[in-house]
C-alpha cells in the first residue's frame, strides 16, 4: 500500500479505538516519517510498540486508557517529544523511565489515573515542564526539590491523592495558572503559598478539609483568579479571603455548613456562576441583587422560604439558570419572572402553592421543573395570545378576515372584543428593561425615517422617469437587477463584503469555492471565477470579476463560468463588466491580482454531462442485525456465512436477494426487504429485481453467486456479536502535510434538530457531523467509506482516497473489506445505515410560532414577509362564522316528500336472517332493529324529455292526414319509451356487524346488477345517518327498536320511544331509548309500551304528549300508535300531567324530575375539528346529527346556546386538542359579539364522561358501541 506515497506527508493520525492487543501494531506507521502527533488511546496496548523509534519528529504521544505497565522502550530516543499522555493505565513507579525527563522539549506529562505511590524520580530535571497531571494516584508526599526547577508550570493537578502537606517551594510557581488539589487530606496545610502565585486563574480545593482557620487571610494579590472551588468542606461561612478577589467569575461553595452570606458579596461584580447548594442557608442578602453579571445561581437543598429570597432579584438581568430545589419555598418573588434571559428554573421538592402569573412571559424559558409540589396550582395562561399556536393566528379579527367577512364586520368584532385592559400588560412592560426599550424606540425611529426617505426617493425616481423623453435609451447598467435565481447556496451573504480575493471552480455545472491556500493554482481542464473586492477612493466597495478558461476545458465548463460570472455581478449589484481570461493569454490586470504568481496543473474535474457506460456492480453479501433500526454487516461471499437465525442480503447489482433463515424473525425480514427497496430506488433507478428466499427454497442463481450450496447451514455467529464501533476521521490538508484526527462523536448531539434542554451524549453517528466543505473517512472495520463534501477542495479529495486505501491495508481486516467512495447527496444506503436517523426529507418545524419566524436571522422587507407567509400553517375556521342552517318548514318538507314518493314506482324490502337476505313482510316496513341489516330495492320512474311543442304539433298534423288505426299506431311508435332507475339502499344498525354488508356485496348486489345492468345505484347508510329521500318513503313513520328482529323471547320489559324531528320533518324518527322517566321532555312526544303477563291482554301502549310539544307531532304520535304497534295491545293517548299511576309510572320505573323545555333545539350546532385534510380545518355537521358523528380521533364542538362543549375522543392527538381549544375560544368570542344576550361558557367533555346537558342534544343517546368486525 506504500505505492500511494502519502504516508511520508502525514503529520498526525488518531488510531484510537483499534485493537492492538497481542503485540500487533501496524508496520506502516514507520513510513510516517513526518509524524508530529500520534494518538493510540483505548487500543489495548500492554507495552509501547517498537515502531515508535522510527518517528523521530514525533512531538505528541497519547496512549491513554490502555493496559500499559511500563513506559520503558523507545520514548527517550525521540528527541522532539514534547507531550506524553499516559493516563488511565496500570503504571507504577518502576514503569516510568528516568531518562524521559532528560528530553529537552518535554513540556506536558499526564500520568493520572495510575498506580503511582510517589512522584517519578528525576522529574525535577524536566525544567521545561508546563503541564503536570499526577491526579488519581496514591502519592502521599511531594519532594521539596520538585518545584525548585519546575518554575514555569502553567497547569498542576495533584487531586485525589494522599497528600497531607504541600512543599513550601510551591511559592516559586509564579506562572502557575491552574492548581487542582481536590480530594487530599490537607487539614493541617495552611496554603500560605497561594498569595505568591500571582498568575493563578483556577483554584480547586474540593474536599480538602478546609475551615476558616486553614485558609489564607487574604488573596488580594491574586488579581487573575476567576474560578474557585471550595465545595465539600467544613466552612460555616464564606471565607473573608474570597471577598478580596477582584476577578472572581465562578465560585462553588456547595456541600458546606454555611448558614448566612455577608453583605460583602456585592464586591463580586464579575461573578457569573455561584453555587451555594447543600448548605444551611435560610435567606439571601439583598446585596446579591447587585451581581449584575450573574448567570447561574444554584441554591438546592437549603432552608430557604419565600421571605428568604430578596424581592429585588429581578435586577439580575443576565440570570439564565436559577435552581432552588429541596427548600421550603411556598412562593417565589414576582420579580424573578422579570429576568428576561432566564432559561432554566428548577423548584422541585418545595411547598409551592402557586407561581406568579408572569411566569408565562418568560420567553426564553426551556426548563421549568416544579415536580413534587403537591399543593401547586399553576396560574392561568394569559388570554388572546394570538399567532402562538403552531404559527396560526387565532385572533377573531384575522379569522373573520380569512372567512371573507366585510371590513365593517371585522371592525365591529374588534370593538366588541376589546374589553378592559389586560392585567398582565404591566408585567410584560416590567419584563422589558429600560435600556432595551430605549434601543427599540431608537431602532423604530431610524426605521421610520429610512422608510420615509426610501419612499420619497422612489417617488422622485418615478416622477423623473415620467418626465424623461420616451425616446431616450437607458444605459445597460441601469437595467441591472439581482437575479431571481437562488444563488445563496453558491454565493454566501458575505461574498464581496470584505476586501480580498474569492475564487470559485466550476464543477458539475455549479461554482465551488476554492480554499485560499490554492489560490493561483489552476487546472488546465477547468474554469474558474475570480472576484476581487477592494475599496475605491471614496471608501466604497468595488469589484473586479474575471472568469478564467483552461486550455483543455470542456464546453459546459466554459459556458457555466461565463453565466455564473454574470449572475455574480448581478447578485452583488456591481457595475463592472465580467472579463474573460484564457489560459496562457492572461491580461496584466489579472496577473497583478496574483502578484504574477500563477501556476498550471494538469487534469481537471469531469464534465457535468452524463457519459453512457455500463455500471459495474460489486457482488457483496450482508448480515442484517439490529431491532429498531437495522444495520448491515458485510460477510464473506460463500454459503458457510449463512446462519439460520439471521436475514442476509445478497447484492448482485440488478439482482438483489433477501434470504431468510429458518429461525429469523418476520420483523427483520420485512425491514431487510424495505432496505432492498431503498437500494433499488436510490441506487439502481428501480431496475433491480428483488427476490425473497426462504431457507430450503433457494434458487440456483443464489448458490451460484455464493460458490455452491454448503452441506449444512450452521449457527456460527456468537450470541453477543456486535461489530466494532465505527471511527470517523476528518481529513486535514495543509501546506505539505496531511492530518487524520478522529471525531469523538460519542459526545456529539443533534444540535440542529434538538432543543438545548435535550442535549444528551449520544454514542451514535449523526448526519449533522458531516460538513459539506470537508472530507471524512468512516472506518467500520469491514468497510471503509470516504465521504466527499460537495464544497470540499479537490486536493483534499485526492488525498483522502489515498489515505483510505492506506488505512484499509494498515489494520488487520477480513478479506472482503472494501474501500468505497460516497459523494454528498448520492450516498449508498449501506453508508446511511451507519448513521442515526439519516434523513433525506426536508425538515419542516410545524411547532414554530410567529415570534420565532419573526426572529429568523437574515430576513428583512419583502423577503421577511414571504418567509412569514411560507412558514404559516394553513387553517380553515370558516365554518365557525357561518350562520346556523335554518329549519325546513313543514309545508316544504311535505311537498318534497310528495314529489319523491310520486317518482317511486315500487319498493321491496329484505332483511338479513342468518347468512341470507329474506324478503321483509310489508307489515314490518318502517320497523328497524339496531342489530340487523336491511336492503330496500327502490324503482324510480324517470320523466321523459319530450320534443318541443312546435315539432309535436307538426307530428300531430301529419298523423291526422293518415287514416284510422294505421296513423294512430305509427304515432304511438314514435313516442319515447318511459325509463326507470333502481337504487338499492343498504341500512345497517349501529350494533350490527359489517358481515351484513359483506354478505350483501357478494350475493344480493350481484343479483341486482345482473337484473338491472347499467341502471343500479347502491347507497350504504347507517342508523340515524339515512338519506332524506329514503326517509321520505316512510312518511315520518320510521321506528328504530333495540336488539334483533327475531330475538329469543324472554320476559318482556317496558320500552320507551322518543319521537323527534331534527331540522326538517323529513328527518323524523321514533327511536327506542332507555326506559327512564328522567328522559321525558315537555316539548316532545313519547311512546311507552308496557307488556302484561296476562294471556288475554298483551299489554298497553301509551302515547305521551308533552304540554309544550308541537301539535303536528302530537297527531303523528297518535298515528304511529294506532298503525305501527301491535293490535293485541290496548292503546291510549295521554297528555302530560294526566298519567295513570297504576300502569304508566310503574311501567316507566317511578316518576322522576325531567326537563320541561328544549330551547337548545333552536341553537344546537355540531362542529368537527380535524387534520385529515393535511391542515387544521373545522367543518359543521348538518342539523340531523347523531351520536355516531362523534369521531373518536377528532375533536367535536357542540353549541347548545348556553355552553360550548369541547368533546375529546380517546385517540385524539395533542396537536388537535391545542388547535381545537383555540378554535373554540374564537367561536365563543365571535358568538359573544353576535349574540351578546346569550354568552357561552366553555366546557370540556371526554368520551365516556358526558353529562345530561350534553347527551340530550343527541336523539336516543346510548352507550358507545365497540368496533365490530
Curated annotation (Swiss-Prot):
Residues 453-465, 952-965 have a biased composition (Basic and acidic residues). Keywords: Acetylation, Actin-binding, Activator, Cardiomyopathy, Cell junction, Cell projection, Cytoplasm, Cytoskeleton, Disease variant, Leucine-rich repeat, Nucleus, Phosphoprotein, Repeat, Transcription, Transcription regulation. Strongest expression in skeletal muscle with high expression also in the heart and lung. Gene3D superfamilies: Ribonuclease Inhibitor (3.80.10.10), Severin (3.40.20.10). The modification Phosphothreonine is found at residue 818. The modification N-acetylmethionine is found at residue 1. One of its GO terms (cellular component) is actin cytoskeleton. The keyword Cell membrane does not apply. CDD domains: gelsolin_like, gelsolin_S1_like, gelsolin_S3_like, gelsolin_S5_like, gelsolin_S6_like. GO terms for molecular function: actin binding; actin filament binding; phosphatidylinositol-4,5-bisphosphate binding. InterPro entries: ADF-H/Gelsolin-like_dom_sf, Gelsolin-like_dom, Leu-rich_rpt, Leu-rich_rpt_typical-subtyp, LRR_dom_sf, LRR_R13L4/SHOC2-like, Villin/Gelsolin. Residues 966-975 have a biased composition (Acidic residues). Residues 1-427 are annotated as: Interaction with LRRFIP1 and LRRFIP2. Residues 495-827 are annotated as: Interaction with ACTL6A. Gelsolin-like repeats lie at residues 509-591, 629-703, 758-831, 1075-1143, 1181-1254. Residues 452-473, 951-975 are annotated as: Disordered. Its main location: nucleus. The modification Phosphoserine is found at residues 406, 436, 856, 860. It is linked to Cardiomyopathy, dilated, 2J: A form of dilated cardiomyopathy, a disorder characterized by ventricular dilation and impaired systolic function, resulting in congestive heart failure and arrhythmia. Patients are at risk of premature death. CMD2J is an autosomal recessive form characterized by onset of heart failure within the first year of life. Is a regulator of actin polymerization, required for proper myofibril organization and regulation of the length of sarcomeric thin filaments. It also plays a role in the assembly of cardiomyocyte cell adhesion complexes. Regulates cytoskeletal rearrangements involved in cytokinesis and cell migration, by inhibiting Rac1-dependent paxillin phosphorylation. May play a role as coactivator in transcriptional activation by hormone-activated nuclear receptors (NR) and acts in cooperation with NCOA2 and CARM1. Involved in estrogen hormone signaling. Interacts with actin, ACTL6A, NCOA2 and CARM1. Interacts with LRRFIP1, LRRFIP2 and MYD88. Upon LPS stimulation, LRRFIP2 competes for MYD88-binding. LRRFIP1 constitutively blocks the interaction with MyD88, even in the absence of LPS. Interacts with the nuclear receptors ESR1 and THRB. Interacts with SGK3. Interacts (via the gelsolin-like region) with TMOD1. Interacts with (via the gelsolin-like region) TMOD3. Interacts with LMOD2, VCL, GSN and DES. This is Protein flightless-1 homolog. It comes from Homo sapiens (Human).
Amino acid at each position: 500500500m506504500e505505492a500511494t506515497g502519502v504516508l511520508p506527508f502525514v503529520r498526525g493520525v488518531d488510531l484510537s479505538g483499534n485493537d492492538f492487543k497481542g503485540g500487533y501494531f501496524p508496520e506502516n506507521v514507520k513510513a510516517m516519517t513526518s509524524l508530529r502527533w500520534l494518538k493510540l488511546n483505548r487500543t489495548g496496548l500492554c507495552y509501547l510498540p517498537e515502531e515508535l523509534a522510527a518517528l523521530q519528529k514525533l512531538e505528541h504521544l497519547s496512549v491513554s486508557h490502555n493496559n500499559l505497565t511500563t513506559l520503558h522502550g523507545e520514548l527517550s530516543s525521540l528527541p522532539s517529544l514534547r507531550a506524553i499522555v499516559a493516563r488511565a493505565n496500570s503504571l507504577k513507579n518502576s514503569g516510568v523511565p528516568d531518562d524521559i525527563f532528560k528530553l529537552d522539549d518535554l513540556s506536558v506529562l499526564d500520568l493520572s489515573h495510575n498506580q503511582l505511590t510517589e512522584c517519578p524520580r528525576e522529574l525535577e530535571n524536566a525544567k521545561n515542564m508546563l503541564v503536570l497531571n499526577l491526579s488519581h494516584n496514591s502519592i502521599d508526599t511531594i519532594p521539596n526539590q520538585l518545584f525548585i526547577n519546575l518554575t514555569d508550570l502553567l497547569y498542576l493537578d495533584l487531586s485525589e491523592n494522599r497528600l497531607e502537606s504541600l512543599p513550601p517551594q510551591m511559592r516559586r510557581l509564579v506562572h502557575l495558572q491552574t492548581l487542582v488539589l481536590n480530594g487530599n487530606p490537607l487539614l493541617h496545610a495552611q496554603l500560605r503559598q497561594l498569595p505568591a502565585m500571582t498568575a493563578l486563574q483556577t483554584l480547586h480545593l474540593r474536599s480538602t478539609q478546609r475551615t476558616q482557620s486553614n485558609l489564607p487571610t487574604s488573596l488580594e494579590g491574586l488579581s487573575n483568579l476567576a474560578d474557585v472551588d471550595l465545595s465539600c468542606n467544613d466552612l460555616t461561612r464564606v471565607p473573608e479571603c474570597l471577598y478580596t478577589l477582584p476577578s472572581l467569575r465562578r465560585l462553588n461553595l456547595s456541600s458546606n455548613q454555611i448558614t448566612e452570606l455577608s453583605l460583602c458579596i456585592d464586591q463580586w461584580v464579575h461573578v457569573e456562576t455561584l453555587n451555594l447548594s447543600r448548605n444551611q442557608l435560610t435567606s439571601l442578602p439583598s446585596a446579591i441583587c447587585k451581581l449584575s453579571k450573574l448567570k447561574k445561581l444554584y441554591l438546592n437543598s437549603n432552608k430557604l422560604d419565600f421571605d428568604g429570597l430578596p424581592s429585588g432579584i429581578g435586577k439580575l438581568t443576565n440570570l439564565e439558570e436559577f435552581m432552588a430545589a429541596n427548600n421550603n419555598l411556598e412562593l417565589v418573588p414576582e420579580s424573578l419572572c422579570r429576568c428576561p434571559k432566564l432559561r432554566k428554573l428548577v423548584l422541585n421538592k418545595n411547598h409551592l402553592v402557586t407561581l406568579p402569573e408572569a411566569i408565562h412571559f418568560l420567553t426564553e424559558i426551556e426548563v421549568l421543573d416544579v415536580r413534587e409540589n403537591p399543593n401547586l396550582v399553576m396560574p392561568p395562561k394569559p388570554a388572546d395570545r394570538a399567532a402562538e399556536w403552531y404559527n396560526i393566528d387565532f385572533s377573531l379579527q384575522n379569522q373573520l378576515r380569512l372567512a371573507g367577512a366585510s371590513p365593517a364586520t371585522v371592525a365591529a368584532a374588534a370593538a366588541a372584543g376589546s374589553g378592559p385592559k389586560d392585567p398582565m400588560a404591566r408585567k410584560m412592560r416590567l419584563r422589558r428593561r429600560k435600556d432595551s426599550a430605549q434601543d427599540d424606540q431608537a431602532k423604530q425611529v431610524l426605521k421610520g425615517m429610512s422608510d420615509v426617505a426610501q419612499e420619497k426617493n422612489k417617488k422622485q425616481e418615478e416622477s423623473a422617469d415620467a418626465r424623461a423623453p420616451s425616446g431616450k435609451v437607458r444605459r445597460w447598467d441601469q437595467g441591472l437587477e439581482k437575479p431571481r435565481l437562488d444563488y445563496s447556496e453558491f454565493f454566501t451573504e458575505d461574498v464581496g463584503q470584505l476586501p480580498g480575493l474569492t475564487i470559485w471552480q466550476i464543477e458539475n455545472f455549479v461554482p465551488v469555492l476554492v480554499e485560499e491556500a490554492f489560490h493561483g493554482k489552476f487546472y488546465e481542464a477547468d474554469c474558474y471565477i475570480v472576484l476581487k473586492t477592494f475599496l475605491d477612493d471614496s471608501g466604497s466597495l468595488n469589484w473586479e470579476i474575471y472568469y478564467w478558461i483552461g486550455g483543455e476545458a470542456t464546453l459546459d465548463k466554459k459556458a457555466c463560468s461565463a453565466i455564473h460570472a454574470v449572475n455574480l455581478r448581478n447578485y452583488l449589484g456591481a457595475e463592472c463588466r465580467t472579463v474573460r481570461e484564457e489560459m496562457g493569454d492572461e491580461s496584466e490586470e489579472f496577473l497583478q491580482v496574483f502578484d504574477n504568481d500563477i501556476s498550471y496543473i494538469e487534469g481537471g474535474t469531469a464534465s457535468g454531462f452524463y457519459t453512457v457506460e455500463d455500471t459495474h456492480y460489486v457482488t457483496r453479501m450482508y448480515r442484517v442485525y439490529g431491532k429498531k433500526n437495522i444495520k448491515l454487516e458485510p460477510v464473506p461471499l460463500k454459503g458457510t456465512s449463512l446462519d439460520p437465525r439471521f436475514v442476509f442480503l445478497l447484492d448482485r447489482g440488478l439482482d438483489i436477494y433477501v434470504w431468510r433463515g429458518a429461525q429469523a424473525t418476520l420483523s427483520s425480514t420485512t425491514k431487510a426487504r424495505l432496505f432492498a427497496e431503498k437500494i433499488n430506488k436510490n441506487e439502481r433507478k428501480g431496475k433491480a429485481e428483488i427476490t425473497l428466499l426462504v431457507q430450503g427454497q433457494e434458487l440456483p442463481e443464489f448458490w451460484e453467486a455464493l460458490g455452491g450450496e454448503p452441506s449444512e447451514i450452521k449457527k456460527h455467529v456468537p450470541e453477543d456479536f456486535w461489530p466494532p464501533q465505527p471511527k470517523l476521521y476528518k481529513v486535514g490538508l495543509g501546506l505539505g502535510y496531511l492530518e487524520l484526527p478522529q471525531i469523538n462523536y460519542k459526545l456529539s448531539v443533534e444540535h440542529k434538530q434538538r432543543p438545548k434542554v435535550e442535549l444528551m451524549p449520544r454514542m451514535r453517528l449523526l448526519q449533522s457531523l458531516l460538513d459539506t466543505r470537508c472530507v471524512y473517512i468512516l472506518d467500520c472495520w469491514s468497510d471503509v467509506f470516504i465521504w466527499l463534501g460537495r464544497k470540499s477542495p479537490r486536493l483534499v479529495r485526492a488525498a483522502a482516497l489515498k489515505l483510505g486505501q492506506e488505512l484499509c491495508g494498515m489494520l488487520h481486516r477480513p478479506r472482503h473489506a472494501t474501500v468505497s467512495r460516497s459523494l454528498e447527496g448520492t450516498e449508498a444506503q449501506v453508508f446511511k445505515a451507519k448513521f442515526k436517523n439519516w434523513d433525506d426529507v426536508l425538515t419542516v418545524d410545524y411547532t414554530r410560532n410567529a415570534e420565532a419566524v419573526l426572529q429568523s436571522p437574515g430576513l428583512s422587507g419583502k423577503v421577511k414577509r414571504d418567509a412569514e407567509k411560507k412558514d404559516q400553517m394553513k387553517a380553515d375556521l370558516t365554518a365557525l362564522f357561518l350562520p346556523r342552517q335554518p329549519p325546513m318548514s313543514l309545508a316544504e318538507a311535505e311537498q318534497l316528500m310528495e314529489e319523491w314518493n310520486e317518482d317511486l314506482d315500487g319498493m321491496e324490502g329484505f332483511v338479513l336472517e342468518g347468512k341470507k337476505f329474506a324478503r321483509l313482510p310489508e307489515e314490518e316496513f318502517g320497523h328497524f332493529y339496531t342489530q340487523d341489516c336491511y336492503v330496500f330495492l327502490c324503482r324510480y320512474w324517470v320523466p321523459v324529455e319530450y320534443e318541443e311543442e312546435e315539432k309535436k304539433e307538426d307530428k300531430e298534423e301529419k298523423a291526422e292526414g293518415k287514416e284510422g288505426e294505421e296513423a294512430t299506431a305509427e304515432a304511438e311508435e314514435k313516442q319515447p319509451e318511459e325509463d326507470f332507475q333502481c337504487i338499492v339502499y343498504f341500512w345497517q344498525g349501529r350494533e350490527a356487524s359489517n358481515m351484513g354488508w359483506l354478505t350483501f356485496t357478494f350475493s344480493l348486489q350481484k343479483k341486482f346488477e345482473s337484473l338491472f345492468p347499467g341502471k343500479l345505484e347502491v347507497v350504504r347508510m347507517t342508523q340515524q345517518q339515512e338519506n332524506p329521500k329514503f326517509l321520505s318513503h316512510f312518511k315520518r313513520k320510521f321506528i328504530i327498536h333495540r336488539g334483533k328482529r327475531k330475538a329469543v323471547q324472554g320476559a318482556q320489559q317496558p320500552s320507551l320511544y322518543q319521537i323527534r324531528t331534527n331540522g326538517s320533518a323529513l328527518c323524523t324518527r321514533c327511536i327506542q331509548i332507555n326506559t327512564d322517566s328522567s328522559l321525558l321532555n315537555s316539548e316532545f312526544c313519547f311512546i311507552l309500551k308496557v307488556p302484561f303477563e296476562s294471556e288475554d291482554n298483551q299489554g298497553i301502549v301509551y302515547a305521551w304528549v308533552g304540554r309544550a310539544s308541537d301539535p303536528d307531532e302530537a297527531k303523528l304520535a297518535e298515528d304511529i300508535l294506532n298503525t305501527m304497534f301491535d293490535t293485541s295491545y290496548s292503546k291510549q293517548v295521554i297528555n302530560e300531567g294526566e298519567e295513570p299511576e297504576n300502569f304508566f309510572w310503574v311501567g316507566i320505573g317511578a316518576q322522576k324530575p325531567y326537563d320541561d323545555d328544549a330551547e337548545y333545539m333552536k341553537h344546537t350546532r355540531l362542529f368537527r375539528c380535524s387534520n385529515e385534510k393535511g391542515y387544521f380545518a373545522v367543518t359543521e355537521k348538518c342539523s340531523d346529527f347523531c351520536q355516531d358523528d362523534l369521531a373518536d380521533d377528532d375533536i367535536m364542538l357542540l353549541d347548545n346556546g348556553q355552553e360550548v362543549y369541547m368533546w375529546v375522543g380517546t385517540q385524539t392527538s395533542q396537536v388537535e386538542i391545542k388547535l381545537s381549544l383555540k378554535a373554540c375560544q374564537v367561536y365563543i368570542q365571535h358568538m359573544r359579539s353576535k349574540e351578546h344576550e346569550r354568552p357561552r361558557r366553555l366546557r370540556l367533555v371526554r368520551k365516556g364522561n358526558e353529562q345530561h346537558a350534553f347527551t340530550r342534544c343527541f336523539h336516543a343517546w346510548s352507550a358507545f358501541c365497540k368496533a365490530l368486525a
